[in-house]
């Protein structure tokens, strides 16, 4: 008789990996199922719960598509496409509010969405990446380093923020402002088009499904990426409205005020796909910069195209071309949002994101969320921090790292492309 084989214990790293996967799947299952246990509307449990797994699946599909697309176009362009698909719920919510001509809610939703992206989204990415690094290597992650090509997104974020200072001082959002903001976004896409795709050597760092797609022939890659983008976008489109309605029942049940829902709950839910994609990448610290740029791309999208859409929809609703006037409270909301995003842009202009910066941004967001009456004080703190960063950049470092990185990328790709002679026919 043969001797019974002895089963060797799995290596500690494998056991830790299994436990981590079990925890992640259990958490995902809880996140998907838990909403259905809330006070259900008409139709029963499954009719109320289906939007949640659908949104999760759509987020994974478009994340895989973007991860593959960065080898066919630039990573920034892939993330710009991703941001458009992910922003569909937010655009839908803002369009409905603009059509109903509720200016105070327009501003609340728009500014709340942007402040959530920076104040909660960016630190959340850092937190997930740091937790992943600690559980895997028992090392503290102190900084997320950006790639040189990410300077395009960082500098592009500054343009609409500066223009919104003009909007703040004049107190109106006009169709001309919308045209300027759209022009900024088109310029941003034009620059991204000049940046080349990622090197093929980096494909080995992909997850299993994107890696298999990139092993297909070129036509197969394009077809698979197109299907993933289209399928994920379609699922997101179908689930967006039921998803928001399900969460609205949560808000009503827990007594959340309508204004609070419009400013914080609705943007959080409409940005849920963006957060899912970013967390998917952030769990691998080496991909944390891509996760961060996913959020930055969403910021650019909302500062430009979302803001440009508002006066257009509002004018159609009124029946003639007009502008949106802001009162003192709405202008204060805009100024606070500008200050926060300006600070975020300056912090990333060093081509890295430090743990102290992530913590500071999160604490300031939490302060103005928990204590709305400290609105003015938080705005002053933001601008004081902005002034400090400008002083350090101009006097101490005497250079803007993002600008230097951008010029290197521009000379390496855009200028070189113009200098290469066209092939003889």
Whereabouts are the PLM-identified features?
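Hydrophobic alpha-helical segments, chiefly the membrane-spanning helices
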Residues: 2-425
């Amino acid at each position: 008789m043969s001797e019974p084989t002895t089963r060797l214990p799995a290596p500690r790293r494998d056991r830790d990996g299994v436990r981590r996967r079990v925890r992640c799947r259990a958490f995902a299952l809880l996140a998907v199922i838990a909403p259905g246990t809330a006070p259900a509307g008409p139709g029963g449990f499954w009719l109320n719960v289906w939007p949640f797994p659908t949104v999760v699946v759509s987020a994974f599909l478009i994340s895989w598509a973007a991860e593959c697309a960065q080898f066919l176009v630039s990573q920034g362009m892939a993330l710009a496409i991703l941001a458009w698909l992910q922003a569909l719920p937010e655009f839908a919510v803002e369009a409905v509010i603009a059509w109903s001509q509720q200016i105070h809610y327009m501003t609340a939703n728009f500014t709340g969405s942007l402040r959530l992206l920076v104040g909660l989204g960016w630190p959340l990415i850092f937190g997930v990446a740091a937790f992943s690094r600690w559980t895997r290597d028992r090392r503290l992650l102190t900084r997320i380093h950006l790639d040189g090509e990410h300077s395009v997104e960082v500098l592009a974020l500054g343009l609409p923020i500066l223009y919104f200072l003009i909007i703040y001082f004049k107190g109106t959002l006009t169709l001309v402002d919308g045209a300027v903001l759209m022009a900024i976004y088109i310029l941003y896409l034009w620059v991204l088009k000049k940046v080349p795709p990622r090197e093929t050597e980096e494909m080995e760092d992909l997850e299993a499904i994107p890696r298999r797609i990139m092993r297909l022939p070129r036509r197969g890659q394009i077809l698979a990426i197109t299907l993933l983008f289209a399928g994920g976008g379609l699922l997101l489109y179908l689930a967006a409205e039921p998803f928001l309605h399900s969460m609205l029942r949560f808000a009503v049940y827990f007594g959340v005020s309508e204004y609070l829902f419009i400013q914080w709950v609705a943007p959080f839910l409409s940005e849920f796909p963006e957060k899912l994609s970013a967390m998917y990448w952030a769990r691998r610290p080496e991909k944390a910069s891509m996760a961060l740029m996913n959020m930055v791309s969403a910021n650019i999208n909302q500062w430009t195209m979302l803001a440009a859409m508002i006066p257009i929809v509002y004018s159609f609703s009124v029946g003639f071309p007009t502008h949106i006037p802001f009162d003192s409270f709405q202008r204060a909301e805009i100024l606070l949002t500008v200050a926060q995003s300006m600070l975020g842009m300056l912090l990333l202009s060093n081509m890295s994101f430090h743990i102290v910066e992530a913590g500071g941004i999160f604490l300031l967001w939490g302060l103005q969320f928990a204590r709305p009456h400290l609105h003015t004080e938080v705005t002053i703190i933001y601008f004081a921090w902005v002034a400090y960063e400008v002083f350090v950049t101009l006097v101490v470092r005497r250079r803007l790292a993002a600008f230097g990185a951008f010029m290197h990328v521009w000379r390496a790709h855009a200028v070189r492309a113009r200098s290469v002679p066209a092939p003889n026919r």
